[in-house]
């Protein structure tokens, strides 16, 4: 397994729509293992392949408490087939939008069909935080970031701040 670089906003790749995975093989499983290791190291609770520069419809999640055993979940070609009409608000963060957070309203339940790590077709009824995380990560697959749900002013302020941080880091690295 290897750590992958996590892309940060602003980056055009993060706004691309990810492609459907045609075949689950050892290379794809290695990518998912790398994604999981990268997510844990960041640390985070979810990561989409596009966040490491791979435009494939893959997400990894683990919302288990830090002090408990890990519970990694792998979703290939996830598709929300139904959402609740009731909403929950969670403070969302994102590894691609470092240091920023905002309260976002999302359906409190969603039904998702997907392929698992081995390419087996599955369905899950996700509730609460798991539902929020799945929706957040699926948004990534469609080029959407949580900041896109904010007002134009708030979003532009965050992007400006991230751009300044990137430039400062580039100056240090060069």
Predicted regions and their residues:
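Positively charged
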Residues: 1-174
């Amino acid at each position: 397994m290897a750590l992958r670089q996590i892309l940060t906003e602003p980056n055009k790749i993060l706004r691309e729509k990810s492609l459907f995975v045609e075949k689950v093989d050892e290379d794809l499983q290695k990518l998912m293992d790398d994604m999981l290791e990268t997510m844990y190291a960041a640390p985070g609770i979810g990561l989409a392949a596009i966040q490491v520069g791979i435009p494939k419809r893959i997400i990894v999640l683990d919302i288990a408490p830090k002090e408990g055993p890990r519970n990694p979940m792998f979703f290939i070609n996830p598709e929300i087939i139904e959402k609740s009409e009731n909403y929950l608000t969670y403070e969302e963060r994102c590894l691609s939008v470092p240091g920023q957070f905002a309260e976002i309203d999302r359906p409190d339940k969603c039904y998702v069909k997907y392929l698992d790590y081995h390419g087996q077709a599955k369905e899950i009824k996700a509730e609460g935080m798991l539902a929020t995380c799945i929706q957040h990560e699926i948004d990534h697959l469609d080029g959407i970031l949580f900041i896109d749900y904010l007002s134009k002013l708030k979003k532009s302020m965050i992007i400006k701040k991230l751009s300044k941080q990137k430039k400062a880091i580039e100056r240090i690295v060069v």
